[in-house]
């Protein structure tokens, strides 16, 4: 399993999710400054798996990176840096203020290299096969999705685990897989 990767926004997350199979959390740019639940989630995930911070290489990216350094134990955080590449993202009409491409504008290999340089850990395939993951079917069987009252049960579990209340069912599944084994999940009393 990868560490949990922290990026600035949804376009960064979309780009990165095509490169790695990892839990990716977005800070919503500076939104993290006013989001106590998201900070708590980062702390929880850092303790469970460790974090890799992968923000843009502009001033704003470094402000966010330094903010995370201040609210999560630095021993649990690795920092991945993308190179300064000048240009503009395809979806934007103009380049960023500093004229640099962000995470979303990087080629897949550049992102992978940045993560490897940061010391990202990859579990080998054997470990993955031997440890079954919590599935959407498990969530359904536990009444946490696809049934009447599922939303209430999810909210109850989210509170019990001290997670952000706005977590979606898929987000909850990611967090559960990052913080516990399938066996532990099946023994949960919800």
Where are these predicted regions, by residue range?
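Short hydrophobic alpha-helical runs that function as membrane-insertion/retention elements
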Residues: 23-26, 51-54, 78-79
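Short, well-ordered alpha-helical microsegments
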Residues: 13, 61-65
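Acidic beta-strand-to-loop metal/phosphate-binding motif
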Residues: 6-8, 46-60
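Short, ordered loop/turn segments at secondary-structure junctions
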Residues: 11, 28-30, 56-58, 80-87
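A short acidic, often aromatic-flanked loop/helix-cap motif at beta-alpha or helix-coil junctions
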Residues: 32-33, 85-90, 174-175
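C-terminal, charge/polar-rich interaction regions
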Residues: 113-116, 120-190
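Acidic, glycine-rich catalytic loops of TOPRIM or P-loop NTPase phosphate-binding modules used
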Residues: 3, 10-14, 18-48
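Long, charge-dense
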Residues: 69-121
